[in-house]
Amino acid sequence: MKLSRRSFIKSSGLAIAGASIASPLFSFAKSKGILGIQLYSVREDMAKDPLGTLKQIAAIGYKNVEHANYKERKFYGYAPTEFKKILADMGMKMPSGHTVLGKQHWDEAKKDFTDAWKYTVEDAATAGQKYVVSPWLDESIYQTEDSLKAFMDVFNKCGELCKKSGMKFGYHNHHFEFAKKVNDKILYDLILDNTDKKLVVQQLDTGNLFNAGVKAIDIVKKYPGRFELMHVKDEVEAAAGAHEKYESAVLGKGIAQVKEVIDLGQSAGTKYFIVEQEAYQGMKPIDCAKEDFEAMKKWGY
């Protein structure tokens, strides 16, 4: 059964309370940015054989990975120091990772984060992360504009917490942020308007917002310089009966204007370009990861 990114985040994220490509064609080109892959792209392989899958990712040429699995103070079953060494031995790093910051991680009475969240930040720093990225907002958080603003203040405080460990805190969008309004204001606009850009960075997913009828190129133009990181994702129309109209596809084979979006982002200051593909149109996920890598290298990343 296909597990959607949204379902995965809800079930696992809320539970806590690239060597150059072998072809000489790309060997000497200067990269436009730091390229990596979100390991959710190969989630089933990582669940079955994390070490073997990481070796395949490294063999493709990826130098950076982004995790989507932090449970019981472990990344894919490995302690932070151990996972960092595993990656280093394969020539890779983990500059960012996805862990949901939820209401349960803020103690309103104490005006402080819970120990569970403090451990999350501590473990991220130990693993070598530069960014702790939260990829979800529970619906209860944006029931009213006041409730959203209150939690955006928690976001800002998390930025301060991460800063103490030499990291930054960030938020990653899906499509609901562009589809939903609060007080007749688009949710995504409220998120950006109520977070301090010095404390909370944005990781724009170039594909997710397609299901809200929004194009990433327009968001990059609207908020130049706000996206230190991007999830690089192409989109195609999903098969009839699918949960959403669009699904991700191999880069360059869809309709999301990916190259134009990331080039514009790069010119405005985007540093990290993280490939993520969640649907595969019959291909093996690891083969998609390879084709995505080749597309990014062809585009100069």
Mark where each language-model region is.
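N-terminal pre-domain/capping segments
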Residues: 2-130, 201, 225, 263, ...
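Active-site acidic/histidine proton-transfer and metal-coordination neighborhood
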Residues: 12-14, 20-24, 106-201, 286
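Acidic-and-aromatic substrate-binding clefts and catalytic sites of carbohydrate-active enzymes
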Residues: 42-48, 68-79, 102-114, 139-143, ...
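Generic structural signal for well-ordered alpha-helices
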Residues: 54, 80-84, 117-121, 152-159, ...
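Acidic/histidine-rich catalytic cores of soluble enzymes
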Residues: 64-65, 162-255
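A short helix->loop->beta-strand "cap" motif at the edges of active sites that frequently abuts
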Residues: 92, 129, 167, 268-271
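H/E-rich (His + Asp/Glu) clusters that bind or coordinate divalent metals
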Residues: 251-254, 259-262, 268, 272-276
